[in-house]
Swiss-Prot record:
The gene is leuD. It catalyses: (2R,3S)-3-isopropylmalate = (2S)-2-isopropylmalate. This is 3-isopropylmalate dehydratase small subunit. GO terms for molecular function: 3-isopropylmalate dehydratase activity. SUPFAM superfamilies: LeuD/IlvD-like. CDD domains: IPMI_Swivel.
Length: 193
């Protein structure tokens, strides 16, 4: 997993509440097992018109938002069916940070396990961040747990374990390898019984 200590990026806002995983990545695009190649289908039914041309009214299609790496959104983001592909699609599109009012528990875990930092902020903070100009950077300071912008600095909470994983770029396998000596000692002990 790629580490995130301080992320500086552009934003795009999609302020809908209850965006479910089928809206994030429709099930018709889940036929591959690789974690890449899903970004082009992110929010597919909203991003594209029936003729597959980009919907000019959809925020991600705005020419001045093409560099966005931070998605600002509503409450209950990632609800619906458990679908790890949704986190893969967000990351493959280039989002490293999602700022929402709340998340589905499973979706939150899928994000953290796949290198997408899910941040929870109240509605008033998200509404202010949503108004930031397209060419303006927002800073995510994970060690100090702050979202820093021209419209304000907003503290956020994150579990210490997840914070450590993001700051050090550790996934579950990397953490397991940190304990490899203890695992080998245990295996030798069990084998000797």
């Amino acid at each position: 997993m790629e580490e995130i200590k301080v992320h500086i990026g552009k934003t795009v806002a999609l302020m809908n509440d209850n965006i479910d995983t089928d809206q994030i990545i429709p099930k018709s695009f889940l036929k591959r097992i690789e974690r890449t190649g899903f970004g082009e289908f992110l929010f597919d039914s909203w991003r594209y018109l029936p003729n597959r041309k980009p919907n000019p009214d959809f925020p991600l299609n705005a020419s001045d938002r093409q560099e966005a790496t931070i998605l600002i959104t509503g409450d209950n983001f990632g609800c619906g069916s458990s679908r790890e592909h949704a986190a893969w699609a967000l990351l493959d599109y280039r989002f490293r940070v999602i700022i929402a009012g709340s998340y589905s528990d499973i979706f939150y875990m899928n994000c953290t396990k796949n290198g997408v930092l899910p941040i929870v902020l109240p509605k008033d903070a998200r509404e202010k961040l949503a108004e930031i100009a397209a060419d303006e950077d927002v800073t995510i300071d994970l060690p100090n747990q702050q979202v820093i912008s021209s419209v304000g600095t907003y503290p956020f909470e994150i579990d210490a374990t997840w914070k450590n994983k993001f700051i050090n770029g550790l996934d579950d396998i990397a953490i397991t390898f940190e304990h490899i000596d203890a695992i080998k000692a245990y295996e030798q002990k069990v084998d000797s019984i």
